[in-house]
A protein has these predicted regions:
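A short beta-strand-loop-beta hairpin characteristic of the jelly-roll/cupin
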Residues: 1-17, 27
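Winged helix-turn-helix DNA-binding recognition segment
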Residues: 10, 19, 116-120
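Extended hydrophobic/aromatic segments used for targeting, binding, or gating
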Residues: 17, 246-248, 254-268
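Double-stranded beta-helix
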Residues: 30-71
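Acidic, glycine/proline-rich low-complexity segments that act as flexible tails and inter-domain linkers
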Residues: 70-86, 95-114, 120, 136-223, ...
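Amphipathic, charged-and-aliphatic alpha-helical interface segments
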Residues: 86-98, 225-240
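Strongly charged, low-complexity linkers/loops
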Residues: 223, 240-244, 248-249
Length: 291
């Protein structure tokens, strides 16, 4: 689960699965679950015969609320460089990429509250399958179905929204996808093909025809929103920094600023932990140095 650790007089630290907290002797502290999560941990004590925990006063509701709120609102101001809708896209995309359905569920409700329609949110979840696979995309959609059903049962309005517009371009899907990729990346269509495209031409055709034509041409999301979603999904998947380099470069080419990408990573850090955000901060730093 997700929890908090706080030493007396210090800010609360948000902790995630896999985190290790080392506590020196005689440090007054508390730890426990985040407001929206369960939390379990293993404690390893050195010198157990002489080293014992001393239980002090309980943490009051006011102390707990103040500590967790300060941590959760750490990036609230800086993240305003992204619109509420964009912040919602980042949250649901990163949770989907990781496969964290427990926290995806409230994030989906927040996306509806941010003004997104059912069809627009579905589009983010559909887009996700190209980067994290059908299983996580479909499980995210099933989770969204639960959210919509529960809101309906509580009398809450869920606007469905419009459908994607029909494609009127008469060019082949490959040509359309090729042109979309050139537009969003700034790489000319006659540039030398990447090594993978030469080695496995079929995947290059699928990328052009399906990803950049069938998906990117659907106008329920802008190119900008799709790339914010893509980077967020890749952050949730983890370990795919070479892919993130390409898509973060596309973000910058589309006019998304380094500050806005940093805000995206702030959201990933708060929701998933630094294990997921820090590798991409390194990518962003390298890209901005090269500009």
């Amino acid at each position: 689960g997700i929890g908090y650790y706080q030493e007396k007089g210090q800010p609360a630290r948000r902790v995630y699965p896999g985190d290790i907290v080392e506590i020196a002797p005689d440090i007054v502290h508390w730890h426990g679950a985040a407001p929206d999560s369960w939390f379990a941990h293993i404690a390893i004590t050195t010198n157990p015969k002489t080293n014992a925990a001393v239980w002090l006063d309980p943490v009051s509701d006011e102390q707990y609320s103040k500590a967790t709120s300060a941590s959760e609102n750490r990036y609230a101001e800086t993240n305003k460089v992204l619109a509420d809708r964009e912040q919602a896209i980042v949250a649901i995309a990163s949770y989907t990429g990781k496969g964290d359905l427990e926290h995806l569920k409230p994030a989906l409700a927040e996306a509806l509250e941010a003004g997104m329609t059912i069809n627009e949110i579905n589009e983010v979840l559909i887009h996700a399958y190209a980067y994290c696979g059908f299983p996580r995309s479909l499980r995210a959609i099933q989770t969204f179905m639960q959210v919509v059903d529960e809101r309906k049962a509580n009398g809450m309005n869920n606007p469905v929204g419009r459908k994607a517009s029909a494609i009127k371009d008469s060019n082949s899907r490959y040509e359309r996808g090729r042109d979309v990729l050139a537009e969003i990346s700034g790489v000319p269509i006659d540039a030398p093909k990447a090594g993978y495209a030469v080695f496995a031409p079929t995947i290059e055709r699928f990328l052009k025809e399906h990803l950049f034509a069938d998906l990117f041409e659907r106008d329920l999301l802008t190119y900008r929103e799709r790339e914010l979603a893509t980077v967020s999904i890749l952050a949730g998947v983890g370990g795919v920094e070479p892919m993130a380099v390409g898509h973060m470069s596309i973000c910058l080419h589309l006019g998304i600023t380094a500050e806005q990408i940093s805000a995206l990573l702030n959201i990933v850090e708060m929701n998933l932990g630094k294990t997921y955000s820090e590798p991409l901060r390194g990518v962003l730093n390298q890209l901005t140095k090269e500009q």
